[in-house]
Design a protein with these regions (language model features):
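Mid-to-C-terminal alpha-helical segments outside catalytic/metal-binding sites
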Residues: 158-168
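Short acidic/histidine-rich active-site segments
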Residues: 138-156
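Extended substrate/RNA-proximal surfaces in nucleic-acid metabolism proteins
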Residues: 3-113
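Glycine-rich, Lys/Arg-enriched anion-binding loops that position phosphate/diphosphate groups
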Residues: 111, 127-128
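Short, ordered loop/turn segments at secondary-structure junctions
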Residues: 90-92, 118, 148-149
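His/Asp/Glu-enriched short active-site or ligand-binding loop at hydrolase and phosphoryl-transfer sites
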Residues: 110-122
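Short active-site-adjacent structural elements
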Residues: 121-125, 132, 151-157
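Alpha-helix termination/capping residues and helix-transition junctions
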Residues: 129, 137-138
Length: 168
């Protein structure tokens, strides 16, 4: 679990802004957070301390081991609060592979999906790529993003974007 609070993310944003200014780079830096559905998330939700994207989009993620038992109610509660949940990298949750109908249930319940371009590029494996492509074919993908953590990820994305796989 990452402590994605306004304080921790805000201080990181300020440090980045300072480094960019010191380098002479003039760009606007805003912040949000990706929230794993866990106890910290529940506390931040109740305290109304969640950082959202424009238009009240909120990035949520499941643990990789198993779906949270309260996922359906979290999706509902977020919408009741006027938030628009985006479930990030759903293609990486292997517990859905044997139950792909669960993707449609979640999407129909109001969870938008953001797949990871690294999955499409094969950066996480064949299963993740296959599921990402299936989600696209079924019209369940609302956004494409990335968990770009290092230069190797950038290289994988560059190769993918230059490939015939991307062009189809």
């Amino acid at each position: 679990t990452f402590p994605n609070t306004p304080e921790t993310v805000g201080s990181a944003r300020e440090a980045l802004k300072k480094a960019l200014a010191d380098d002479g780079t003039d760009i606007v830096i805003e912040n949000s957070a990706e929230y794993r559905i866990d106890d910290l998330f529940a506390r931040e939700l109740e305290a109304e301390r969640l950082m959202t994207l424009p238009n009240n989009y909120i990035l949520i993620e499941n643990p990789f081991v198993r779906e949270p038992g309260n996922l359906d109610s979290v999706i509902f509660d977020l919408q009741v609060r006027g938030l628009r949940p985006i479930l990030v990298h759903p293609e990486r949750y292997s517990y859905y592979y044997k139950h792909p109908e669960r993707y449609e249930v979640l999407h129909n319940a109001g969870a938008m999906f953001q797949i990871n371009v690294l999955s499409l590029a094969g950066g996480y494996g064949k299963d993740e790529r296959k599921i990402a492509e299936m989600l696209i074919e079924k019209g369940l993908v609302d956004f494409v993003g990335t968990d770009l953590h290092n230069a190797a990820h950038a290289d994988i994305i560059d190769r993918y974007l230059a490939s015939s796989d991307y062009l189809k």
